Each structure stands twice: as structure tokens, then as C-alpha cells.
Amino acid sequence: LIDADNIEYESANKTTIFTPNFEVPEVVRGESNSTYSDIYAFGILSYLAITIAHPFKGIGLEEAGWDSEETNKKEQWELPWIEDSNDDSNRSNNGLKGPLTITQDLYKLFRKLFENGKEDKYKRPTLPTWIEFLEKAASSTILCHGCGMSYYEELFPNCPYCKKAKPTRLIVESYYYKNEQKQQKRWKFVKEINEDIKSIELPSYIFKTFNILETDDIFLEIKFINKSRVELSFNKNDEEVYFESQTAMRSLKKGLSLNKLENGISIITKSDIATFVEIKIEK
């Protein structure tokens, strides 16, 4: 997802080469490229992939076309991005923007990148930050069984594309835990449940600090044994896990009724941070 033409660190590169539609300001101007250039190109591609709209292809580009009489016509990369908070001269109605595709946290990153970070590369959000918030956005979506589109579970009462009712789903909410009390919410994970489902795997970042090198690691697998029983299977190392007890679990497995999971359970995990995780099935 990163423009290979920009892959450098802080070393100088005097050759100006860039991919059309993925221009990075400092690279086009002939300045040295760097990891900050990669971040800018990554942001363009991310916005395009999420919304199906290019962040700099708006009415400003259309109004300054090939037959324009302007002598100081701006290039695409010089225009404000299409959702600029201070300049709507390049706005666009194309694509799937807004709550359908972009969370508020992601909007903050895009604005920081394309507004504050356009000319000052040191203000661009780091790649680990992008990965974390893209993962947060993806993990809070559900797949519609009617049209096959994904949408943010907590924002819509039913599918915004085909209006089909929400499927039965597992909802997992993770909070910071301090002084025996749950604190600020840190993560939400949602997964649709169908009749044929065998198990649902919950990533480590729900229970522990987010680590970009461990995004695929599984901490808890919920196995649907039959129509009335489930099994919790933990993949823990040195973490302390508390479930319905003030004593840390010794066994890596715990069986319980499906009805109990429907009513909701909570798990406390203590590692580099302490988390309070609520898990339940909603219909």
C-alpha cells in the first residue's frame, strides 16, 4: 500500500520520480523523499480504497481543465483535498464518504495528513498510528447477509445499503481497567454470527496493548460446540486472566452455556496494561 517510488528514509534522492495520482508535495518539488513521503502516499491510497474517491480529484480540478484560460492553473496535488475543513474549492460529491466509510478517528488522521501535514511532513501521522485506527475501523464493521456490503454496526439500525435487518452478532467492547473499575473504552470488535459458524477468534489487541507486529495474533477463540454450549479457549502467555473469579485462571479453556454468552460475560486481563472486556451476543 506504499508507493515504492518513495521508499527512502532521510537520505537524499535527487531524481524526481513519482506515480501519477499519488504525488507527494516534497517529491514533486524535487526534494528528498523519506518515510514521511511514504505516509502521504499511503494516506492517498487509503482514502481511495475506503471511499472509492481520490482525495484530490474535485471540482477544482474540473474547473481548471485543459481548456481553462488560467495561466496559473494548479496541479492536482497542489489543490486542497476534497474534504478540507477550511477550503471547499475542491469539494467532491463522488465516492462513499461520511459515516458510511470513515470513522471520526480516521477523519482526524486524514485532516492531519492532508491539511497540517501537506507542507509540514513532520506533522503527518505515523504509519503505526494509521494501522491501529484502520484496524479499529475494520473491526467495528459487520457484513450484511443481504447485499454483502459492510457497515459500522453501532451507527446504523439496519443495513444502510439494502435496509436488511442486522444479523445476530458477537459484540466485544474493551475498556481500560484501573482501581477495580472499567475506565475509558479502548476498542470495539463486532462479528456477525450465522447458523453454520464454528468459532470466532478475538485478536490480542482487544485484551492487550496494540502492537503492529501482532495484529494477527489470537488471544481468545470462542468455539460454538453445539446450539447450547460454547467453549472459551485462551492463547495466553504471561498474562493474568480473570473470569468470574478473583483468582487468575489456570486452565486455558472454559465451557459455558450459550445463554450465558447471550446475557453477557466479562473478562479482566492484566499484562502490560489491565483491560476489562465485555462479550455478548445481540440479535
Give a label for each model feature.
Residues 10-33:
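Conserved activation segment of eukaryotic-like protein kinases, specifically the C-terminal portion
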Residues 125-135, 139-214:
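Regulatory extensions appended to serine/threonine kinase catalytic cores
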